[in-house]
């Protein structure tokens, strides 16, 4: 698998994110303006995200999936049953279809999404895992989960392990610096922000448990 193969695969996933966001919003039955109001962003940003003209930040993406009651898997991978007309698949169709899937995920097969502010997420599971987000996260030089002083919070608990680079983690008023081999765990309902503190890209393994039970905060 070449770097070009991985890039092309990611681009094909990226191209469908806006359509899936729009489908999820339509399914809930709210306007772009109303979603923007709930998230505290401009309606034009929602329009740009749905049209593929802008990338969401980590905070905005978490806010959107929470408000629309969808999982990250549904937005990144595309789930025809959830992102289509909302109708459940007939039982007889499920019984007739056989889709064996390996639990192994190779680097070139990861579902990935590029976010604003130099952040990239690659899913490390082959199938949708419900209330579990298991990702390989990359923070480019200067990359951050949210802009300065704009912390996010959501339901769940986070676990992280740094592979490369220096990752800054702010939790409330506390600041932590993680170097390769360091790990961290914290309650996601606490305001937090992740950012690259060094001069090389950060690579980390991140695990969020229970975010799907969220109610908007």
Regions picked out by a protein language model, each given a short descriptive name:
Residues 59-74, 80:
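DNA major-groove recognition helix of helix-turn-helix/homeodomain DNA-binding modules
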Residues 19-38:
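Short basic helix-loop element that most often maps to the first helix and adjoining turn
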Residues 134-139, 185, 190, 199-215:
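A short hydrophobic beta-strand segment most commonly corresponding to one strand
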Residues 40-56:
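Recognition helix of helix-turn-helix/homeodomain-like DNA-binding domains
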Residues 107-149, 206:
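A short glycine-rich, His/Asp/Glu-containing loop-to-beta-strand
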Residues 136-140, 153-169:
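Short, conserved beta-strand element in jelly-roll/cupin
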Residues 172-187:
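Short acidic-glycine-tyrosine-enriched beta hairpin
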Residues 78-117:
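Short, charged recognition helix plus adjacent turn
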């Amino acid at each position: 698998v070449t770097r070009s193969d991985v890039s092309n695969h990611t681009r094909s996933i990226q191209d469908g994110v806006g359509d899936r966001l729009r489908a999820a919003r339509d399914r809930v039955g709210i306007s772009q303006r109303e979603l923007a109001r709930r998230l505290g962003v401009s309606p034009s940003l929602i329009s740009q995200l749905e049209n593929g003209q802008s990338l969401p930040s980590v905070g905005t993406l978490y806010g959107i999936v929470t408000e629309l009651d969808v999982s990250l898997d549904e937005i990144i991978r595309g789930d025809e049953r959830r992102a289509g007309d909302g109708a459940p698949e007939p039982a007889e169709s499920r019984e007739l279809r056989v889709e064996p899937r390996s639990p192994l995920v190779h680097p070139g097969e990861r579902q990935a999404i590029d976010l604003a502010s130099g952040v990239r997420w690659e899913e490390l599971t082959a199938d949708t895992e419900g209330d579990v987000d298991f990702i390989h996260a990359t923070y480019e030089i200067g990359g951050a989960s949210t802009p300065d002083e704009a912390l996010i919070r959501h339901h769940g608990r986070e676990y992280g392990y740094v592979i490369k680079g220096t990752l800054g983690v702010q939790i409330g008023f506390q600041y932590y610096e993680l170097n390769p081999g360091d790990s961290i765990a914290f309650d996601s309902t606490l305001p937090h922000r992740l950012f690259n503190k060094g001069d090389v890209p950060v690579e980390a393994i991140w695990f969020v448990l229970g975010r799907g039970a969220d109610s908007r905060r």
